[in-house]
Amino acid sequence: MKRTFICLLGLILTMASCTDKLSEGYIGPSDIRIEDGVMTPEALLALGRISDPQLSPDGGTILFAVSYTSVEENRSCANLFTCNVDGSDRRQLTAYGKSVSNARWSADGSKIYFIYDGQICEAPYRDGELGRMKKLSEVPAGISGFAVSPDESRVIYISSIKNTALETPADSDPALDKAQAYTTESLMYRHWDHWRTEVPRSYVAPFGAEEITPDNSVDILGEGNLYELPLEPYGGIEQLSWAPDSRHIAYSCKKLTGIEYAFSTNSCIYVYDCESGGTVAVTTSGGYDTDPAWSGDGRHLAWISMERDGYEADRQRLMVCETSLDGGFTVGEPRELNPNFDNDIAGIVWNGDEIFFSSLVSEAVQAIFCADLGGQMLRVTRPDWNFDFDSPFAVLKSGDEVKLLTSYQSLHFPTELVAVDIRESGTSYSQITSENAHILDQLDEVSEESVLVETVDHKQMQCWILYPPQFDSTKVYPAVEIVLGGPQGTNSQGWSYRWCYRLMAQQGYVVIMPNRRGTTAFGQEWKEQISGDYPGLNMQDYLSAGKYLKSKPYIGKLACVGASYGGYSAYMLEGMDEGLFDCFIAHAGIFDEKQLWFTTEEMWFANWDNGGLTEYAYQKGQTGPAGDGITFGGMQQAGAPYATTAKARRHYASSPSSMVTKWDTPILCIHGMMDFRIPYEQGMAAFNAAQMMGVPSKLVVFPEENHWILQPQNSLYWHREVYDWLDRWLKN
């Protein structure tokens, strides 16, 4: 049993160089003490969160951010740190009261550029010390991301423009500046968690010689359109990439608006010429094309591509084309490097003529791979390593040895920096940072197991199981089955600050995490099966996993818990589990599919998955109120509740709301009111239905949260409600 308290002396020493610069509002590492080795929600929120590592130009120092949380102040704050490549000489560079983000080294390593308070700033760096901050931009709309060109003559930055398709009263009458209303005549007027009053845009400006302002900045997309660059809601500076010549910029953009935007995923790769202002399309059709990245010599451009328009979970392919930057820009024919690779590509990183990337694989872990331009792909991380590795942020070569600098995490610990060493004698890893050792070392260990469960159609389904500390198979434990969101995702070794399975196990629960149909680590066939079959085989997969666990003599009562599609699954299983589960928790779940179709924002998702399509194009077809059973109002809508497709009709007829008369098990419904993906009325409707069926039920609504619960105090309350519910129905 580990209850050793490691003092914060090491962390305090790293702050010595900047303690005289502590800003008002600064949030530092927690000195929390754990009682009896049991992890708590408070301990989870106390963990430092590492992000955005960057290697110095000389290859010796890693720059990274760490965010700490104050529950009392109800916020988090990120500051900058450095350490040597081997993890030694950890230094804290900033101690600001507001978060620092997007930190980057200057080309010679003498400065660090970063965003602070919505503007680009710089500070001199020398011998582990950061000098006085200087603001480089004055952009009234603010800056959320940037990338400096290789020769440091130009900078790309992300800001925003007003969305003229969504009007407010003050737009037509300035005297109505206190009136609050939104007026529109087109989709999409809101996205994820916000009304689309602004549109993200990317600009190019001179760098270094003068202050960056709107007056000396050029909008890459030009004027007279409302296209997004980068794509909302998750896109950032990774959607733009400087060419080595510091003149050309590759970027990803979906050049659509209105209803076409709402039904299509057709983003394409373009190259912008900073000198001529011209743009060349590298791709023109299909689904998402994202994350462009130039090779170091500028002779190749790579990106991630989905083949089919409208299918946001299509296989993420590694694409490449030849390019020439001599006297302008020319591009060759795009090609997929390896069409036989049956998993999704993420995080492409060039090193010479090789590309490193990460991918979720059949062991239900995220592994690192290396590809050459001939299409050969080799797995770098070992199959017996139960970690999720991110793509490397740097590759160091010395003779025949290769060192990948990256980050990793597991079900047992959050993100840390790590080095993966590749030698002829074998591959090994060594952890660089130990940001949370002073907290994790106070906790009792939980154990894990990977098992295969037979499904109703005699396939083998991988499941992770976590066991509580000091697990004893002669005793009886309450258990929790995790029903996954997505629906296209994977229960891997990823750490979560919301659904933290180690925290769950440390409360005395056995936790099973099935990778049912629709998960992404087991090939495209396994993933695609779920589209058009929400009430079908994947629900049977969950029942198979639950029955497998309940067959063990050490398992007592069992809960079913999930968010998003997992919330839908909880609502669905409430009506079909035949007494398998003793309570349910549904967070941000779909209760009524027909209602959701008319209120969600990303129509492409519901259109594809509800109709089970295999091909799609948003282009307008026949118009009219009835269309052809698939086309309505000029749009192909095979997944609509008014479509005549067999899969769509089955889908809506089998909505969880159709099964409420079979509900008989206690259920907790949780929802955020700023959730525009699955609006909060879904949670209210499910709770109301449970009440009307006489089922013990509880509703928790967060007025200021979206699909996720992000504010620290709300997160703490969310955890208390979840564990109070589990304890009430499984332990008492």
Would you name each region that the model predicts?
Residues Y26, C77-A78, S160-I212, S217-E223, ...:
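Predominantly five- to eight-bladed beta-propeller fold
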Residues M513-N732:
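Active-site-proximal cap/loop segments of hydrolase catalytic domains
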Residues N84-S88, P124-E129, F207-E211, D273-G277, ...:
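Short loop/turn segments that connect beta-strands within beta-propeller blades
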Residues L47-I62, G97-Y113, P140-V155, Y189-W195, ...:
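Conserved beta-propeller blade repeats
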Residues T433-K557, A563-S564, F598:
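Cap/lid segment of the alpha/beta-hydrolase catalytic domain
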Residues E42-A78:
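Beta-strand-rich domains and repeat architectures in extracellular enzymes and scaffolds
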Residues E72-A78, I115, H194-E198, E260-S267, ...:
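Short, solvent-exposed loop/turn segments at conserved positions within beta-propeller repeat blades
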Residues M15-S17:
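C-terminal motif of bacterial Sec signal peptides marking the signal peptidase cleavage site
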